[in-house]
Design a protein with these regions (language model features):
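Flexible, polar/low-complexity N-terminal or interdomain linker segments that lie immediately upstream
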Residues: 1-50, 122-130
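Conserved beta-strand scaffold positions in the cores of enzyme catalytic domains, especially
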Residues: 19, 33, 54-59, 103-105
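Short, structured coil segments at secondary-structure junctions
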Residues: 29, 53-55, 99
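A short alpha/beta connector and helix-capping loop motif
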Residues: 45-63
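Short, glycine/charged-enriched secondary-structure capping and boundary segments
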Residues: 46-50, 74, 93-97, 118-121
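Catalytic cysteine-centered active loop of the rhodanese-like fold, especially the PTP/DSP P-loop
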Residues: 60-114
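Cysteine-dependent PTP/DSP-like catalytic domain, specifically the C-terminal lobe
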Residues: 105-130
Length: 130
C-alpha cells in the first residue's frame, strides 16, 4: 500500500491515469464494469451491458469487496463505478494493493454513464455487434 500511495503524485492525477471515460472503457476488449454501489442502489438503477459484448458488469457492494475479490478477474480491465467516485476511489486503491494492475475509476458518475448509454449510442453498438 505504501508504494501505491507514493505513486499517487501530481503527475499521476494531473494526467488522469486513474480514471477512464465510459466511452473509452466501452471500447476496451475484455473489460469489467465493477459497480460498487449497495444492493439497494443497484436494485433501483441497474447497469447491464447486454449490447456491449466486450464488457461485462458486476455489482459487488464496497463492503463485500474483501470477501468477494475472487469474483473480479485480474486479467481483465476493471473500471470501478459509483455515483460520486468516493467508493470507487477506495476500491481502486484496494484493488491495486491486492495486485490488480489494470484498474481505473469511471469518471463522471451517473451523468457520464447515462450519456454513454443513450439510445442512439446503444443502437450503434448493437448494430455493430450483429
Amino acid at each position: 500500500m505504501e508504494q501505491i500511495l507514493k505513486n499517487l503524485t501530481l503527475d499521476f492525477f494531473g494526467k488522469g491515469k486513474h480514471k477512464i471515460s465510459p466511452e473509452k472503457f466501452f471500447k476496451i476488449e475484455n473489460g469489467i464494469l465493477l459497480d460498487v454501489r449497495s444492493k439497494e442502489e443497484a436494485g433501483s438503477i441497474s447497469i447491464k451491458m447486454e449490447y456491449h459484448f466486450n464488457v461485462e458488469s458486476i455489482n459487488i457492494p464496497i463492503n463485500e469487496i474483501p470477501d468477494r475479490i475472487d469474483e473480479i478477474p485480474k486479467e481483465k480491465s476493471v473500471a470501478v463505478f459509483c455515483p460520486a467516485n468516493v467508493r470507487s476511489a477506495i476500491v481502486y486503491a484496494y484493488l491495486l494493493s491486492k495486485g490488480f494492475s489494470d484498474v481505473r475509476i469511471v469518471e463522471g458518475g451517473y451523468s457520464a454513464l447515462t450519456e454513454a448509454l443513450k439510445p442512439d449510442k446503444v443502437l450503434k453498438v448493437s448494430q455493430n455487434e450483429k
